[in-house]
Amino acid sequence: MTKHFISKALENMDRFGGSFVQSLAVCYRKADPDNQTILYNAFEHLFFKYVKFKDD
């Protein structure tokens, strides 16, 4: 997990995600590093989904 990976995933979560995923992106940005790790570990599948997301 790199900063670029997280940044791209969050950008796509904001742009293409539903209300839950958009809220998760907001929470992640506001969280301290320990809580960011908790959120990432709990929702890793969503981070991977949105880092690869293409609007075709």
How would you label these PLM feature ranges?
Residues 1-4, 52-56:
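Short intrinsically disordered terminal tails
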Residues 21-55:
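Short, charge-rich amphipathic interface segments used for partner binding and complex assembly
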Residues 1-27:
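N-terminal acidic leader/helix
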